[in-house]
Amino acid sequence: MKAIILAGGKGTRGKPYTEYFPKAMNPINGKPMIDYVVRYLKSFNFIKEVIIISDYNGLGGQIKNYYGDRKDIKFIQDSQSGTGGDLLHIEKELKNESEFLLWFVDNLCAVDVKKMRETFKEKNSFACIATRTKRKEETGFAIVENGIIKKFKEKPIMKLQLSECLGIYMLRKEIIQKIKKKKQKQVNLSFDILQELSKEGKVSAHDIADKEWVDAESPMMLERNKKLVTKIIKQMGL
């Protein structure tokens, strides 16, 4: 199996930082965030190759410079036309594969990729998405009765009414043919492709359970969630 890391995008949410370096290079303990993702993926023996998609003609060149001439990582120029276009760029890289892992670089999580793969196969799904059903809130809550606060709850762990989808996917290679059939410049993987497949019962979910997750969009976000990031890296075994 090959793991594809999407490290392109304009990093709009991470501005002004992403005007100077890509979000993949957000620093964590002196190393870029993408390095933790790469090392974690390589800890699974069934992942034979890591491919990083980014704009190497722009800020993404910093990623390539960081890794230098490493032979165990392949660098593919992004399409500048969204996730769908990026996946079309790697079609030939998947020639001998039946499935692949897709990881958006700003997702930091010790999701058990082995168990996720088992879910993917057991459900005979076209796609499997990492999800979570609970999260720790960033603000305090209160129990209110008749306008009077009876009790405070400091940043509680809340059960979500709907499962939250994370940016980590396991996909059949045939997904690329479905993207081609759309014949449109911008293809949103979730809403243009997976939405249709979900109606056919072909999209499964892998709950990350007690594993933590953070959307690492900027250095500010990482700094604000420093304890959480440290916990995730420990869960990753790094």
Located regions from the model:
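Conserved N-terminal catalytic core of the sugar/cofactor nucleotidyltransferase
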Residues: 2-5, 13, 27, 31-104, ...
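A structural signal for short hydrophobic beta-strand segments in well-ordered beta-sheet cores
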Residues: 25, 142-144, 205
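Anionic-ligand binding region
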Residues: 127-129, 135-159
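Short, high-confidence coil segments that cap the C-terminus of an alpha-helix
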Residues: 47, 97, 124-125, 201
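Active-site metal-binding loops of divalent metal-dependent hydrolases
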Residues: 10, 105-107, 133
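Catalytic-core segments of class I nucleotidyltransferases/pyrophosphorylases
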Residues: 101, 108, 117-121, 148-238
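N-terminal nucleotide-binding beta1-loop-alpha1 segment
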Residues: 1-19, 202
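Conserved donor-nucleotide/metal-binding helix-loop-beta segment in metal-dependent transferases, i.e.
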Residues: 111-139
